[in-house]
Every structure is written in structure tokens, then in C-alpha cells.
């Protein structure tokens, strides 16, 4: 799960943006980072400019996640890799859900059993290796 900086989430109206935030993974203590070259990973430094993310509601409970500095969108590919796309595609939409532990989970809309996750090393976890209730995010 990722803990948004505003302390929580709920569905917000389609077409609206949330204030830029950082998504934190309790497992390993990493913030999700989107690089300008399209790489995605985790970093512990709160001051890293590439952890500032803009979430936009596409429909109720569905968001796109854009790296503010990278100007790229988080995407999950058909092989489960996470990367950052210059354009919004159907692989850039995620179901956002506030879990009982007050962390948000982000599940791919296109590959509906796969979640955004970081390993304890800060590398992203393949979507095919994720599931609900996972410790990695």
C-alpha cells in the first residue's frame, strides 16, 4: 500500500487533480519515483524531486499517476513491468483503494489482478508477482 501525504484518499470527482504528493511504501520505507527516462523505482530521500506525483481522477475510483518533474505517467505493461509513459494509455489507469490499514493500493485497471508494488530493495515488483494484502505495497 502507498500512504498518500494527505493522510488518506477517497474517490474524488473525475477530471480533478489531487495536490501533488508522494506515495510511500511502508515495506522498505521507499517513495515511488518516476524518472524522466521512463524508469520507475523507489527512493528513501524525501527531497528527491522525482517523487512528486500528480494523481488525476479518470473516473470514480480510477486514477492516473503522473511524475511532476518527469512529465510521464506510471504504466503497467502486459509483462507486469512498471515504467513511465510519455502519453496516457490504457496501461496508465489504476484503481485506487483506501485499505483498512489506512494505506492506499493501486491496482491496474487493464491487468486487474496486478498491483503497483515496491520490493524491500526499492525496485518495483512485477505485477504478476503481486496480489491483495501483499506486504510489498
Swiss-Prot record:
Covalent link Glycyl lysine isopeptide (Lys-Gly) (interchain with G-Cter in SUMO1), residues: 86
A single cellular component GO annotation: nucleus
PTM entry text: Phosphorylation at Tyr-73 regulates FGF2 unconventional secretion.
TM helices/strands, residue ranges: none
Domain of life, source organism: Eukaryota
CDD domains linked to this entry: beta-trefoil_FGF2
GO molecular function, one term: heparin binding
Cellular location(s): Secreted; Nucleus
Pfam families associated with the record: FGF
Residues with the Phosphotyrosine modification: 73
Example GO BP: positive regulation of ERK1 and ERK2 cascade
Chain positions of site Important for interaction with integrin: 119-120, 125
Binding positions (heparin): 27
Annotated region (Heparin-binding), positions in chain: 119-135
SUPFAM superfamilies xrefs: Cytokine (SSF50353)
Keywords recorded for this protein, A-Z: Angiogenesis, Developmental protein, Differentiation, Growth factor, Heparin-binding, Isopeptide bond, Mitogen, Nucleus, Phosphoprotein, Secreted, Ubl conjugation
Keyword Secreted: yes
Gene3D superfamilies on file: 2.80.10.50
Primary localisation category: secreted
Main function: Acts as a ligand for FGFR1, FGFR2, FGFR3 and FGFR4. Also acts as an integrin ligand which is required for FGF2 signaling. Binds to integrin ITGAV:ITGB3. Plays an important role in the regulation of cell survival, cell division, cell differentiation and cell migration. Functions as a potent mitogen in vitro. Can induce angiogenesis. Mediates phosphorylation of ERK1/2 and thereby promotes retinal lens fiber differentiation.
Family: Belongs to the heparin-binding growth factors family.
Assembly and oligomerization: Monomer. Homodimer. Interacts with FGFR1, FGFR2, FGFR3 and FGFR4. Affinity between fibroblast growth factors (FGFs) and their receptors is increased by heparan sulfate glycosaminoglycans that function as coreceptors. Interacts with CSPG4, FGFBP1 and TEC. Found in a complex with FGFBP1, FGF1 and FGF2. Interacts with FGFBP3. Interacts with integrin ITGAV:ITGB3; the interaction is required for FGF2 signaling. Interacts with SNORC (via the extracellular domain). Interacts with glypican GPC3.
Protein name: Fibroblast growth factor 2
Organism: Oryctolagus cuniculus (Rabbit)
Lineage of the organism: Eukaryota, Metazoa, Chordata, Craniata, Vertebrata
